Curated annotation (Swiss-Prot):
<dbReference type="GO" id="GO:0004324">
    <property type="term" value="F:ferredoxin-NADP+ reductase activity"/>
</dbReference>
<dbReference type="GO" id="GO:0050660">
    <property type="term" value="F:flavin adenine dinucleotide binding"/>
</dbReference>
<dbReference type="InterPro" id="IPR022890">
    <property type="entry name" value="Fd--NADP_Rdtase_type_2"/>
</dbReference>
<keyword id="KW-0274">FAD</keyword>
<dbReference type="InterPro" id="IPR023753">
    <property type="entry name" value="FAD/NAD-binding_dom"/>
</dbReference>
<feature type="binding site">
    <location>
        <position position="296"/>
    </location>
    <ligand>
        <name>FAD</name>
    </ligand>
</feature>
<dbReference type="Pfam" id="PF07992">
    <property type="entry name" value="Pyr_redox_2"/>
</dbReference>
<keyword id="KW-0285">Flavoprotein</keyword>
<keyword id="KW-0521">NADP</keyword>
<feature type="binding site">
    <location>
        <position position="337"/>
    </location>
    <ligand>
        <name>FAD</name>
    </ligand>
</feature>
<feature type="binding site">
    <location>
        <position position="57"/>
    </location>
    <ligand>
        <name>FAD</name>
    </ligand>
</feature>
<dbReference type="InterPro" id="IPR036188">
    <property type="entry name" value="FAD/NAD-bd_sf"/>
</dbReference>
<comment type="similarity">
    <text>Belongs to the ferredoxin--NADP reductase type 2 family.</text>
</comment>
<feature type="binding site">
    <location>
        <position position="97"/>
    </location>
    <ligand>
        <name>FAD</name>
    </ligand>
</feature>
<dbReference type="GO" id="GO:0050661">
    <property type="term" value="F:NADP binding"/>
</dbReference>
<dbReference type="InterPro" id="IPR050097">
    <property type="entry name" value="Ferredoxin-NADP_redctase_2"/>
</dbReference>
<protein>
    <recommendedName>
        <fullName>Ferredoxin--NADP reductase</fullName>
        <ecNumber>1.18.1.2</ecNumber>
    </recommendedName>
</protein>
Amino acid sequence: MTSSANIATDSPANTDVLIIGAGPVGLFAAFEAGVIGLSSVIVDNVERAGGQCIELYPDKPIYDIPAIPSCTARELVDRLLEQCRPFAPPLHLGHRVDTVEQLDNGRWLARTDKGLTVESAAILIAAGNGSFVPQRLQLDDAAPLEGHYVHYSVSNLADFAGKKMVVAGGGDSALDWALALRTVAQHVTLVHRRNGFSATDSSVANMRRAVEAGEMNFAVGTIASLNAPGGQLESIELRQAEGSVQLATDHLLVLFGLVADLGPIQQWGVEVRGGRITVDTSNYESSRPGIFAAGDIAGYPNKQKLILSGFHEASLALRKAYSYAYPDKKRVHIHSSYDAKLAERVAASHT
């Protein structure tokens, strides 16, 4: 699988199916597309593959994937990426698809916020609950510091080596990053509005052990203001039950979780009800022929929000998409057990 986080080109990538979303359903769709003879390109707004599984609960167990009694969300994503390898679908991360237009020849042209263009015969939207954006710190003095001293993600631990850090949040991401940062930062303080957490028990236990060992601090309270004379963060004001305190820090990492937003999808002319794209359950096609939806973003009566359901939806959608990519060609069904070409691809991808 080829990956790119930043591409801008005047020549559009050409493919049979554009898959919007690199969560479990989007990744499986790329594999299934290859199995039935379709090329695909995957685009996702987030900087890493995995969708909600990786962004919200990477280390929580999943029990309802056929033939896998138990695995973490991270393990599932890793296995799906491995499954895709025989077809090497281009994977463009950190790209939000902003516009989708139908060309005179019936094909689709999609453009991302970073200048990537993809032309395809069909589009499969597997974007979960839409684009994920971080919940920002709701303080007027935070915005000018974002990207320099106030952060909503970590790209490289080394960027914070020797720095004083405050990490805000109570979920897995906040605790895990606080624990990771303590290995490189001069000092780390985790702050959360209460003494209870939404993180896994193991993450909470690891954090409390680190605090007891003096490897990091934990404080209960809410961030009231930022002290940044000359535009450089020096401390935060933490409001607590007994009053306010100043915590010295060089950087503030805010991990309040992610919020879902359909964003530009609402402007693509597909019927949307209750935040879901309405689909025909015979083929999971939207109200615009050639645009399909699978996974949590697909809406229909008795919808079950399961990864398993998304796999089924994507499989049927791609079979209809085949007719747009190859209208004059009859698709011949071959069971994977008897597909010699598939066997060769799988073998080659592991050499």
